[in-house]
Amino acid sequence: MDLTWVTEGRTTIAVPCQNPDVPFPPGTAPVFYNSRMALNRDSTVLVVRQTHPHSYLDAMAASGIRGCRVGYETGVPVTFNDRDQLAIDLITHNVQSLGIKADITCRDANSLMSDEKFGFVDLDPFGTPAPFIDAAIRSSGKYLGVTATDTAPLCGAHLKAGIRRYMARPLNTEYHTEVGLRILLGNVARHAAVYDKGITPLFCYAHEHFVRLHLQLKSSASAADKSIARLGYIHQCPKCPYRLEEQKFFPGIHTCPLCGASLTPTGPLWTGSTHDPNILAGMIEDAETFIAGDPSGLLKLLALCRDEPDISFSYDYHKLGKFYRLSPGPIDVLLNRLRDKGYRAGRVHYSGYGIKTDAPLEEIRDCISS
């Protein structure tokens, strides 16, 4: 296996050489490494630095970059696991090169997580994490990280696959990214409740081709009940921009008050907060000084998440203007007008044209046309 050295964050490891002349170079290497996921791993390092778990499991380690960064940049003891012996050989090489404290296992991830417990369990599979979530919850002592790259099923483009994997009905709307994030959160919350565990989102977001969750788990029936109480649905009008959030385990039947159409429900999904303000504030402060290289992209994401209103859906600013046949001005002007009227309003972290507000559509329209 031909290797090359890469530096990500403060960590330098060896990774297999890739063919740069194909559409997806990481797929050409004998052991997987995707440089496009560096921001994902940056955020994980910052969360681990805020939470200080006693141990960390990189359950599908591949090249080992995630676990190597956690071990080298936080000092937390890491267990690396992969079922591919080539990956294990590469991880061993990288661990020895970095001199970090680590255990390395070559097992099926579900089998390992069923047998052992870790302070922080991290799932970063190729594709859906759905087959691993149950075992990960049982294995986690306190913290859980989940990456999903199957955004088409999560966000409603592949409806049947989304229903099969996540036992929820996705919806391919203008805010489908938000739907995907909250469906994944809701799925984890339901799995956790089976074991009398509740979830608290620490920093959860959607970026480019993936959804990323960082969660704290609390073991108690009351914590599980509180999580279940935060499950609900978004009801979307198929004919106009009206939408309704409903915190219920089973969806009601609703009619659009503006045009009379039957609303389409999506869910069950998480309707609670997607981040912890204290964790996020600590991550922002840490990122400014700790993350090596240019942290501007990560800092922008963190700031957008910090300022994003705690609302389960968003509007596409341009589509609102088109629907109302108005020429919208700058987004920030609209947001300031809504805030001046006493409404919550802000940008979303996953779209340059997305806005969140609790203002009714009539008020939004009036503020656009002012």
UniProtKB/Swiss-Prot annotation:
Residues 4-368 form the Trm1 methyltransferase domain. It holds the Pfam family TRM. S-adenosyl-L-methionine binds at R41, R66, D82, D108, A109. It is an enzyme of class 2 (transferase). InterPro entries: SAM-dependent_MTases_sf (IPR029063), Trm1 (IPR002905), TRM1_arc_bac (IPR022923), tRNA_met_Trm1_C (IPR042296). GO terms for molecular function: tRNA (guanine(26)-N2)-dimethyltransferase activity; tRNA binding. Dimethylates a single guanine residue at position 26 of a number of tRNAs using S-adenosyl-L-methionine as donor of the methyl groups. It catalyses: guanosine(26) in tRNA + 2 S-adenosyl-L-methionine = N(2)-dimethylguanosine(26) in tRNA + 2 S-adenosyl-L-homocysteine + 2 H(+). Its EC number is 2.1.1.216. Belongs to the class I-like SAM-binding methyltransferase superfamily. Trm1 family. This is tRNA (guanine(26)-N(2))-dimethyltransferase. Zn(2+) binds at C237, C240, C256, C259. GO terms for biological process: tRNA N2-guanine methylation. It comes from the Archaea. The gene is trm1. Keywords: Metal-binding, Methyltransferase, RNA-binding, S-adenosyl-L-methionine, Transferase, tRNA processing, tRNA-binding, Zinc.
